[in-house]
Amino acid sequence: MAEARRVLITGASSGIGRHAARRMEQEGHRLTLICRNHQRAAETLDWIDPTTRVLEADLADLEQVDTLCATLLQEQEPIDALVLNAGLQYAGHRQPRWSRQGIELTLAVNHLAHQLMLMRLLPLLLQADEPRVVITASEVHNPTSGGGRVGSPAGLGDLAGLRSGAGSAMVDGKERFDADKAYKDSKLCNLLMGLELARNQPRLPVIAWSPGLVIPRSQDGFFRESRRANPLGQTLFGVVARDLLRLTESIENAGDLLTRLVLQLNAQPGFQYWSNSLTRPGQHRFEPTAPSAEACDPETATELWRLSDHLIATALADQC
């Protein structure tokens, strides 16, 4: 077996992340899994391995994320791979939800919590001999992709909502909340965050990836909030997309792809984006892909990072 790698994973309590974590644990790697509460931590340990290290932090609370990072920094254990996989969406809900710091929940969890972790834990990554960052994004960040064409397209505009601080429902500053677009925008933020990180740390491999459409049969995981808003519609959507049209990828295959990116891919310094694209019903091809034009804009990436950093700092200062 190859030398055990030290891997920190968010979003390992269900779905793709949980499957990948189990694979990596079975291969003898040293995992630290971030779970949002004690119940999720216990369930994750039961499914993966009772000896796996789990730390609790709710990504909807930047103060908890900051405390988590402080704990890891105090330990001074290098991180070989930082896997930013956690994500949520609540399409179907008409009103925005808010984090503890008053930030729209999709942005807070999918983007800001992960940028905070990147900023705080970067010293531990740079202590490792062969570090890498892996970010789970989505093809829906791209308005020309299959999923990106459904509903309002991703687009950050001039970042007016982010610029105005906590309390804005949409990153682009639009007053009307659109939960589906908020998710797409958060995935666009993930790619831009990775692009800016790679620019600032040119020797660090930064890999963003899209797993394809994954719709499990279970009632928990990624689509749980959307099922609560529209249980019948989401059930029918799953049956049609997964079972009839065969447009989806399985949790197992997607988890294996994530494991490959973390452990097996010969990652080169700089930013790269991989997509698990549907080629025909039941068939996917996993390969390097060009992100959307907006996801490649260096000026937007730099400004997004700056404004996100400012919002994080302001939110944490207000907790004091």
Residue locations for each model-derived region?
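NAD(P)H-dependent oxidoreductase Rossmann-fold/reductase module
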Residues: 1-80, 87-89, 148, 171-320
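A short helix-coil junction within the Rossmann-fold of NAD(P)-dependent oxidoreductases
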Residues: 75-76, 93-94, 120-129
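Active-site loop of short-chain dehydrogenase/reductase
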Residues: 78, 125-162, 203-205
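Active-site beta-alpha turn of Rossmann-fold NAD(P)-dependent dehydrogenases/reductases
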Residues: 86, 134-137, 169
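Helix N-cap/beta-alpha junction loops of NAD(P)-dependent oxidoreductase domains
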Residues: 89-94, 142
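Short alpha-helical oligomerization interface
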Residues: 92-108
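Ankyrin-repeat alpha-helix packing hotspot
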Residues: 111-112
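A short, exposed helix-loop element centered on a Lys and neighboring polar residues
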Residues: 118-119, 195
